[in-house]
Amino acid sequence: MGALCSSETYMLDKETYKKQVEHNKMIEQDLDKDRKLKILKLLILGPGESGKSTTIKQIKIIHDEGYSVEEKLIRRHGIFMNILEGIEEIHLAVGRENKSYKNPLSFDHIHEVRMFTENFKKADEADKILGAEVINAIQKYVKDETVAMMLRDKTVYNIDDSTIYFLDNFSRIIQKDYLPTEEDILKSRVPTSGVIQYKIMLKNFNFKIFDVGGQRAQRRKWLHVFDDVHAVLFITSLSEYDQVLREDATVNRMKESLNLFEKICNGRYFINTAMILFLNKIDLFEIKIKHTNITVALTSYKGPQERDSALDYIRKRFVSLNKNKKRSIYEHVTCATDTEQIQVVIDSVIDVVIQHTMQKVGIQ
């Protein structure tokens, strides 16, 4: 009886063996799909100062726990540095535009700021506060009629928006108990060096988000994060069409961005990768287009000097660079510092990444 039972069991296994192997293979395939979906990699690329790091900050504020008190205290030092660098930026713009100070003491104020900045860079973190003398120098400097005029017409003279913001909030920032707000952090600038990785749970999926330095010298560091990327978010600044690269004053920023997008979009690493395009800084673009035509960068543009027409032309220029006609470019016009607007856009981006990845591994 026992032998019969053994024989029947053997015969049953033999008959179903092939089906069992096929079933196990299907299970392994499903597990493999789960493994592939376990971590989704989103690579954020684009030229320097386009808004990549600001977008990362928004994701942290919207979908994570925001910034702790300790993190805000660390950011405070960076904001002080942004103000000091902003004053130097204004001074350089005065010379670049062949303007003259109305107050001859403005040169003394600049000297005070420069001396303080050098010491600030060398100081220990605990000592990085704005002293009374440099505060006084900054307050007097921005009252110079030439400086005040340039700050009012910031887009004409390409004064960074964060510089304007921090100077507008200077009286609050210099208080001894100053703790940066989330808006302060969004406006702050810390150039990304190399590749910075963030891990975050978004809509029940584990994401790895890579923020990559956009300056030319940083781009060679992109290569090792290209493997198995599920989506690329390319961010470009709409408002910098009349500006040149910091690292090369002969190269227009808009042209550089178009060239970079073309290389990334059609690169061998991203043949099957979802491609998302942020046309960022629409708020500054709307101001600048009123006095500066996009023809300074895009000479083939023949349309009117107004927002919608110029924006549509820029959008089409970017999209036309995609040589893979089977792949869509998911475009969004954004203002990365506008939390309410960017929340809707980021949610859409997350959905695109998840859906594209599921389709890629065969999960519909």
Curated annotation (Swiss-Prot):
Q: Name one GO biological process term.
A: adenylate cyclase-modulating G protein-coupled receptor signaling pathway
The record's section on SMART domains has:
G_alpha (SM00275)
Coiled coil residues, start to end: none
In terms of superkingdom, the source organism counts as Eukaryota
Residue span of region G4 motif: 276-283
Span-the-membrane segments of this chain are none
Which residues does the UniProt record annotate as the domain G-alpha? 38-364
Annotated function: Guanine nucleotide-binding proteins (G proteins) are involved as modulators or transducers in various transmembrane signaling systems.
Q: What is this protein called?
A: Guanine nucleotide-binding protein alpha-8 subunit
This protein's species is Caenorhabditis briggsae
